[in-house]
Amino acid sequence: MILVSYDISNDKVRTKFAKFLSKFGFRLQYSVFEIHNSEAILSNIENEIQNVYMKSFTEEDSVIIFNLSATCKKTCYGYAKNEETDVF
């Protein structure tokens, strides 16, 4: 599983990036997506960031990708809105 966290100042770029990520996983919080990954999906996301989105980023923008192992434990507190298990 990977977590993608982003802080993008431009509304248009941020919306486009969120729509792009939603093709691969689901939103955990406003700027955090959970993606059940394969090497191909991770490569696709990284290539898209480097080749498309980096051109639009300012010095204030960032994207952080956490590549988590299958043995990582996930604990949720509160009332999560997205409990999807299957992503197509």
Question: Can you say where each PLM-predicted feature lies in the sequence?
Answer:
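Alpha-helix boundary/capping detector
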Residues: 3, 34, 43, 47, ...
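Positively charged, polar, low-complexity stretches
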Residues: 11, 31, 37-47, 52, ...
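Short, flexible coil/linker segments at or flanking structured domains
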Residues: 16, 21-25, 30, 51-56, ...
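Short linear sequence motifs
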Residues: 10, 23-26, 46, 70-72, ...
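Extended, hydrophobic alpha-helical segments
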Residues: 1-41
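C-terminal structural segments of small proteins and small subunits
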Residues: 53-88
